UniProtKB/Swiss-Prot annotation:
Primary location: cytoplasm
Phylogenetic placement of the source organism: Bacteria, Pseudomonadati, Pseudomonadota, Gammaproteobacteria, Enterobacterales
InterPro entries according to UniProt: Ribosome_maturation_RimP, RimP_C, RimP_C_sf, RimP_N, RimP_N_sf
One cellular-component annotation, GO: cytosol
UniProt keyword annotation of Acetylation present: no
Function as written in the Swiss-Prot or TrEMBL entry: Required for maturation of 30S ribosomal subunits.
Family: Belongs to the RimP family.
PANTHER family: RIBOSOME MATURATION FACTOR RIMP
Species this protein is from: Shigella boydii serotype 4 (strain Sb227)
A Gene Ontology BP annotation from the UniProt entry: ribosomal small subunit assembly
Entries under Pfam families matching the protein: DUF150_C, RimP_N
Name this protein carries in UniProt: Ribosome maturation factor RimP
Compartments, record wording: Cytoplasm
Keywords: Cytoplasm, Ribosome biogenesis
NCBIfam families: PRK00092.1-1
Length: 152
């Protein structure tokens, strides 16, 4: 998934502090709006609890206060990826081959921006998703948002 320049810079800045606390930085989203939001997703083998999120928030806030890469007011949110886990990297897609995913594309493919199907394969920066029995190939750089579809 293509990250903005700001998201790339933020990822570089906060990866080390997150990993130093023993967590994986799953990904980040910076959502611009009336009240902008920096959303950070973390995970660990043992799962994530509220105290973990608070610890990461405290550490990341300290880094962001010093570096000050965001020029607008924003809210910082730290959370686990949840059941509808967002996918950010080729490694994430490869880890969840065989799982159902929803995709929102930056540019339409076959006049569609929204797709839902099962991740079949990952090849470099391309993913194959089986949609209604047919394989569709998408460039990771064209994926604006991707989430696993939880099944109960």
């Amino acid at each position: 998934m293509g990250l903005s320049t700001l998201e790339q810079k933020l990822t570089e800045m906060i990866t080390a502090p997150v990993e130093a606390l023993g967590f994986e930085l799953v990904g980040i989203e910076f959502i611009r709006g009336h009240t902008s939001t920096l959303r950070i997703y973390i995970d660990s083998e043992d799962g994530i609890n509220v105290d973990d999120c608070a610890d990461v928030s405290h550490q990341v806030s300290a880094v962001l206060d010093v570096e000050d890469p965001i020029t607008v007011a924003y809210n910082l949110e730290v959370s686990s990826p949840g059941l509808d886990r967002p996918l950010f990297t080729a490694e994430h897609y490869a880890r969840f081959v065989g799982e159902e995913v929803t995709l929102v594309l930056r540019m339409a493919v076959q006049n569609r921006r929204k797709w839902q199907g099962v991740i079949k394969a990952v090849d470099g920066e391309m993913i194959t998703v089986t949609v209604e029995g047919k394989d569709e190939v998408f460039a990771l750089s064209n994926i604006q948002k991707a989430n696993l579809v939880p099944h109960f």
